[in-house]
A protein has these predicted regions:
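Conserved phosphate/pyrophosphate-binding and hydrolysis machinery centered on Walker-type P-loop NTPases
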Residues: 17, 36, 49, 61, ...
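Core recognition of P-loop NTPase motor domains used across DNA-transaction enzymes
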Residues: 38, 43-48, 57, 69-70, ...
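Cys/His-rich Zn2+-binding cysteine-cluster or related metal-binding knuckle/ribbon modules and their
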Residues: 1-6, 11, 15, 25-90
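Long C-terminal interaction/binding lobes of large macromolecular proteins
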Residues: 2, 99, 127-199
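Extended interfacial segments that mediate partner engagement and assembly in macromolecular machines
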Residues: 24, 72-142
Length: 199
């Protein structure tokens, strides 16, 4: 329909998560209207991130070198490991300024339907970190989905088999601040009730 380079750009943009054909077209035309400097700046940023960013050799978070900034930070408490599914999950936890431990990024969650088994995740590496390190607590912060819950239980069981004195905790889940009870689904409300605490 369009010139081949435009069609190719639309096709490539539509491969991004959450970007459909129409949004890809709008983005492609935005790039065409942008200055050459801005368009080439975007292309260079994409190339640079693919060339320079890899995974931390310790926690598997995104890193520009062998280790990520968090693993290199001597002020972090290495006795506490927070387990997350993806590198993007580290960001909201860091924004709270409440957590000073280190992380372990699994690279996904268990999902037999999608063909994601324990061997496809960084679970063996997590168990090795706990076994070989001075870890006192593992905070499992996988998403509150069926896959996230299955992953959390699998990890908890794998860590119990180590027979070490390691506390395995799960992030509390429940109602967000300002939520109305009438709009809460049964699972969320049930978890909020189960996780209630004294005032």
């Amino acid at each position: 329909m369009y010139a081949a380079p435009v069609d190719r750009l639309i096709t490539e943009l539509s491969k991004l998560p959450g970007i459909g054909q129409r949004t890809a077209q709008r983005l492609a035309f935005h790039v065409l209207r942008a200055s050459e400097q801005d368009a080439l700046g975007l292309a260079e940023a994409i190339r640079e991130v693919k060339e320079r960013i890899g995974l931390c050799e310790v926690c598997f978070n995104l890193s520009e070198g062998p280790r990520c900034r968090i693993c290199e930070d001597e002020r972090r408490d290495r006795s506490v490991i927070c387990v997350v599914e993806e590198p993007a999950d580290v960001i909201p936890i860091e924004r709270t300024h409440e957590y000073r431990g280190v992380y372990h990024v699994l690279g996904g969650a268990l999902s037999p339907i999608d063909g994601i088994d324990p061997e496809d995740l960084k679970i063996v590496e997590l168990v090795a970190r706990v076994r070989d390190g001075d870890v006192g607590e593992v905070v499992i912060a996988t998403n509150p989905t069926t896959s996230g819950e299955a992953t959390a239980f699998y990890i908890a069981e794998a860590l119990r088999e180590l027979e070490r004195d390691v506390s395995v905790t799960r992030l509390a889940s429940g109602l967000p601040m300002g939520a109305d009870l009438e709009y809460a689904d049964e699972i969320t409300l049930g978890k909020a009730l189960a996780g209630r605490r004294a005032l």
